[in-house]
Structure formats: structure tokens, C-alpha cells
A protein has these predicted regions:
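Lipid interaction determinants
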Residues: 7-95, 101, 106-170
Length: 170
């Protein structure tokens, strides 16, 4: 069973809060984009997953493991599951944009709020080196409340990342 937090069943008429952050191609070398970042801590027994793309798009979510090794599960059952990834990219949730300023990384993604709308979520942290980042805060824009998480993510090389094309990010 594959479960990514934030998956929902939106249609074109549903409410979609704007990200408020423009997508810009990432040309830096502060973080690697030829793989994914995996959290060292879990949230409700699910590890955090961040995938960064050179076009400025990101995937930021938690994955549920079905008993396999986490790396094997993420690579085979999540990232290489073409039909699942197609459904994920066609819904406005867990996807967004990122930007890097000096040693700060900011990811803004959508999250499912209720059956008919999404909200923007900010994950902000610091770059330790090109293979390690730490998310310090998560803020939900509608609530104006920050959650301090201090979750370290380590890079895992992976050359077969799924395409990042989505109609929700221009």
C-alpha cells in the first residue's frame, strides 16, 4: 500500500491557495538534485521525503513504509511507480517550489486542508552541506503558527527520479 500524506481528489473547480513564491530554475550547487533527501526522524512513523528539481519544483511529503527497507520502498514503490507519481503530480498537494538564499532553504508546497481546498505550507531550514539539510520550522500559512521541528535530511543518490511536470506550477 502506497500512502503519501496530502493526497486528495481535487478537480478543476476546487479552491487552490496560491503559493506566493515564483518558480525559478535552480542553478546553484548548495544542494544536490540528482536524488532525494530522506529525514532522520519520522512523523507518525513516516519518514520525510524531499525531492528537488533543477527547474525549481519540489516534492515534500512523508511516506508510509509497508515493511520494506525505507530506501527500497521510496525508490521502487513511490518514485518509480509511474501511475502513482502521475496521480501525485496531477493533484495540488505535496508539490511546490523551493528557493535557496545563501545557506537557507525554503520550500513552499500545498497541503490538503479539507475536501475542497488546499493551503500553502512553508518548510524553512538551513543547508549544512550539499548532502545534508535541516528543516527548522514548518508554518501553515492560514494559521500563522510555526512548528519547530529540527529534522535533518540526508541525500540519497537516485538517477531515475520521476518527471516534475505538473499543471499547477508554471
Amino acid at each position: 500500500v502506497v500512502l503519501l500524506l496530502g493526497c486528495n481528489f481535487f478537480n478543476e473547480n476546487d479552491s487552490l491557495e496560491g503559493l506566493g513564491l515564483e518558480r525559478h530554475p535552480y542553478i546553484g550547487k548548495e544542494l544536490r538534485t540528482d536524488g532525494y533527501y530522506l529525514a532522520t526522524k519520522t512523523h507518525k512513523n513516516m519518514p520525510g521525503l524531499i525531492v528537488l528539481y533543477r527547474n525549481g519544483v519540489c516534492l515534500c511529503t512523508y511516506v508510509e513504509n509497508s515493511g520494506k527497507s525505507t530506501k527500497q520502498y521510496i525508490e521502487n514503490d513511490v518514485l518509480q511507480n509511474k501511475s502513482y507519481m502521475h496521480r501525485l503530480w496531477s493533484k495540488p498537494t505535496a508539490i511546490g517550489v523551493f528557493m535557496i538564499t545563501k545557506r537557507t532553504v525554503a520550500l513552499r508546497t500545498w497541503e490538503y486542508q479539507n475536501k475542497r481546498s488546499t493551503i500553502a505550507i512553508d518548510n524553512v531550514g538551513e543547508i549544512i552541506n550539499d548532502t545534508t539539510l535541516r528543516i527548522n520550522t514548518i508554518a501553515r500559512t492560514y494559521a500563522g503558527v510555526q512548528q519547530f521541528v529540527y529534522n535533518v535530511y540526508h541525500f540519497v543518490p537516485f538517477s531515475n527520479k520521476p518527471d516534475s511536470t505538473t499543471s499547477f506550477i508554471k
